[in-house]
Amino acid sequence: GKDMKICTFYNHCSHRGNLLAMEPSGTAKRITCMFHQWAYDTKGNCVEITRQKEGYQDRISKKDMGLREVKTEVGLGGFVWVNVDDNCGPLKDFVGDTLDYLKDELSTKPLEIISYHKSVVNSNYKLWYDTNSELYHDFLHHHNRKIALIQPGYWERRVHTHDYGHISVDSMECRYDAYEGNDGQQRQLGWPGGEVACHKLIDMFPTMTFILRSPAFRLDTMVPLGPDKVIIEFRGFAIKGDSAKDRDARVRDHNSIWGPFGRNLPEDEIAIVGQMMAMKNGDDSTYILHGREEPSIQNEIGMRHYYGEWSKWMERPASDPFGNRAIAAAE
C-alpha cells in the first residue's frame, strides 16, 4: 500500500469466493473480481459493490465485506512470513536462534530471486523434509559419494537442534574443483557476510529449508496437497547489485549444480517417490527407521527431533499415529 506496509489476504472474493488475483505479482491499485465486479483496495477494503443499493438495500455495507487478512511479518532476512493461524505467537519466538547461523549472510546485503521452479512430487511432504534433514543419504548422490564424503571436515560436522523442531548443520567447504565439468577450478566468489565456497544448512519445521552453497543460495518451501502429493518450490537467490560477472557465476552454479539442472534434486525426488510407492502398498514397509546415533554428521537426530515436534502438534506419537499398539494390547 501507500504506507509501504505489506499485508496478506486470502485470495478470494467476499461475495462468491471467486479467485481474485490470477498472477503471482503486479502493481494494481485495486483488485476487481471478474465475476460480479466487486473491487478491493490494497488494504483489503471493499470499495465497490455493483448495484449495491438496488440489490441489497441497506442490508450489507462495504465496510463489512473486506478481504480476510492473515498475520504477516517482514524480517529475519527480509522475507515475508505469513501464518494463517490467528492465534499464533510472535515469529521471533517460533524461530528463536535458528537463523542466527545465517544472520550475516541474510542481512549484509539485499537479496533478490534469480531462479524459481517447482515440482509436484507424488510423495509425502515429510519424506522430502527427511532428505534435507539427514546426511546419511549422501550415499544416494553421485557427486556426494565421490566428493563430499572424502573431504576434510565432512565427518566432524554436527547437527544442532533448536526449539520447535528446527535444526542447523555445521558448515563445510564445497569442493567445486572436484566436480565434473568445472576444469578443476575452485570458486573464489563467496557470499557477503560468509565464506567462500561454504555449505550451510538450516531446516525449519515443518516445511522450509535454507541452503547456502556459496556462491549460490536456495530456499525450499513445501505445500502438501495430500498424504501422497506435495508441491516443492525452489527459489534461488543472488545479491542485489551484483556485477554481471558475479551474477552469471551465481546463476550458473545454482542452476547447473544445486538447482533444476543439477543431479541432487532429481536424485532426492526419485528416492522419495520410491518410498511412497512402497508405503502405499499397505504392507510392512509403511514405516521409517531413524535410529542412527553416532558422533558424526550422519547421526539421524534431525528427523527424530522433527517427529518429536510433529507428535506435539498432532497430539499423537509419530511412532504409532493410529494407536495400533493400544488396540493390539487391548486384544
Report each predicted region and the residues it spans.
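C-terminal catalytic domain of Rieske-type non-heme iron oxygenases
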Residues: 11, 73-331
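Rieske [2Fe-2S] iron-sulfur-binding domain
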Residues: 1-86, 92-96
